[in-house]
Design a protein with these regions (language model features):
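A charged N-terminal "starter" segment
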Residues: 1-145, 187-192, 219-226, 397-422
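Hydrophobic "anchor" residues on beta-strands that sit immediately upstream
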Residues: 56, 145, 233, 271, ...
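Short beta-strand segments
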Residues: 58, 145-151, 197-199, 235-237, ...
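Active-site-proximal loop/turn and secondary-structure-junction residues that shape catalytic pockets
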Residues: 61-63, 84-85, 105-106, 126-128, ...
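Short acidic, glycine/serine/threonine-rich loops at helix termini
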Residues: 67-68, 91, 111-116, 133-136, ...
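Conserved beta-strand positions in the central sheet of alpha/beta enzyme cores
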Residues: 79-80, 123, 147, 197, ...
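Active-site loop/helix belt of alpha/beta enzymes
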Residues: 152-295, 358, 384-386, 395
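Charged (often Lys/Glu-rich) extended helix/loop segments that serve as interaction or gating elements
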Residues: 260, 268-422
Length: 422
């Protein structure tokens, strides 16, 4: 469920007409619903209420500091994968003991910053990383809680670019090597084992891969405890998917996901961490755009809008589907016409949808791309020298710009001409 609904013939974000946001902020613009973000976070929190837990929002999904503060004030922890994300979480007021640092390529400078500031735990992904972290922690005179991300070789049944738990993926340590890795960590100064980490992919719409992975984690927990390691915490990652098309079958809900976790690892007495991102933010945001032209081509018609692939890359990168709807509610039974919905960028790949059936659309009409809250604004670029678009947060009948539209001067001012060209 989300809070983007038609009311009085106009699509609203909670109690605010999207047409009002377009008038005052302009288009394109990302618009988020605070009520939807909070509802989705609380669904996860309630799904794990049977035991000690922390829901760590995956900052990479939508990293605006206002969104992080909204979720943090509700009790969320944060899963970060870079110093930049860590700094965003801290800027949002998230205490270090609620920040988990993940990622396959942590640098020494990132480690130093995080260890100086404090962190809940660091999820290690390789032997070279754990040795580097040991050296850095020793030099700083601190002991850091760590888990090891194990790769369970489980097929997540998702897009190949967002699958992370197969043996040929770059993430984690093969589960077959886990005992040896934990044994080495026990000898390294500055590191204190507190648990196990696993994450098998994103946009999963089937619970069985989770069940298989968590069963392997449960077995490994018993083995590592027998070896003398204190396995007190299980970071089970994220990945639960969302319905990008209203016609999709509904994916599992957090309550069902929480039940799988309890069935597979609940008997171990561990604190549970999860790292949802897409399900919290995905349907909590839309990309608001305006039709520039309706172009009639040879054999197909085009809606050319002012948003482009630099604003929302998912259709071009993943072939992803987003429901696309007019802001003005079409009349019941209105005629439908097939359009290719495209942006202004000079690539054929700048296509949001092909042969998508839409009611009559004219230049100036507003259109909303649904389910754009996750991996939308965070993956935007300035390709074709297009400024980054604003982000707007709605709560009830109020809204605020939480990131202003980038100006051309701001974009160009970062470039520097060397003196020998002047």
């Amino acid at each position: 469920m989300d809070h983007f609904l038609y009311r009085d013939g106009i699509l609203h974000a909670e109690d605010v007409p999207l047409s009002e946001i377009a008038r005052t902020v302009g288009t394109p613009a990302y618009v988020y619903s605070a009520a939807t973000l909070l509802r989705h976070f609380r669904l996860f929190d309630e799904a794990l209420a049977w035991g000690p837990h922390l829901v760590c929002y995956a900052v990479k999904a939508a990293s605006n500091v206002a969104i992080l503060k909204l979720l943090g004030d509700a009790g969320a922890g944060m899963d970060v994968v870079s110093e930049g994300e860590y700094r965003r979480a801290r800027a949002a007021g998230i205490p270090p003991d609620r920040i988990v640092f993940s990622g396959v390529g942590k640098t020494e400078s990132e480690m130093r910053h995080v260890l100086r500031e404090g962190v809940r735990q660091i999820n290690l992904e390789s032997e070279p990383e754990m040795r580097l972290l040991s050296r850095v922690a020793s030099e700083l005179g601190v002991e850091v809680p760590v888990t090891v991300r194990v790769n369970p070789d489980v097929d997540a049944r998702t897009h190949e670019k967002i699958a992370t738990g197969k043996s040929d993926n770059k993430f984690g340590i093969p589960i077959s090597r886990a005992r040896a890795v934990y044994a080495e960590i026990a000898t390294l100064p500055g590191l204190r084992v507190i648990g196990i980490d696993v994450h098998i992919g994103s946009q999963l719409t089937d619970l069985e891969p989770f069940r298989l992975a968590y069963r392997k984690v449960a077995d490994l927990t018993e083995v590592l405890r027998a070896d003398g390691h204190a396995i007190e915490r299980l970071d089970l990652g994220g990945g639960l998917g969302i319905p990008y098309a209203r016609s999709n079958l509904a994916p599992p809900v957090p309550l069902e996901y929480g039940r799988v976790i309890r069935e597979e690892v609940g008997h171990l007495g561990c604190e549970i961490e999860i790292e949802p991102g897409r399900l919290i933010a995905g349907n909590a945001g839309i990309l608001l755009t305006e039709t520039i032209f309706v172009k009639h081509g040879e054999g197909r018609d085009f809606l050319i809008v002012d948003a482009a692939m630099n604003d929302l890359i998912r259709p071009a990168m993943y072939g992803a589907h987003h429901d696309i709807v007019p802001v003005i509610e079409p009349a019941p039974g209105a005629d439908q016409q097939a359009f290719d919905i495209v942006g202004p960028i000079c690539e054929t790949g700048d296509t949001f949808a092909k042969a998508r059936h839409m009611p009559p659309v004219a230049p100036g009409d507003l259109i909303a791309f649904r389910s754009a809250g996750a991996y939308g604004a965070v993956m935007a670029s300035e390709y074709n020298s297009r400024p980054l678009v604003p982000e707007v947060l709605v709560q009830g009948d109020q809204y605020a710009v939480i990131r202003p539209r980038q100006t051309f001067d701001e974009m160009i001012s970062r470039d520097m001409v060397p003196h020998w060209l002047e």
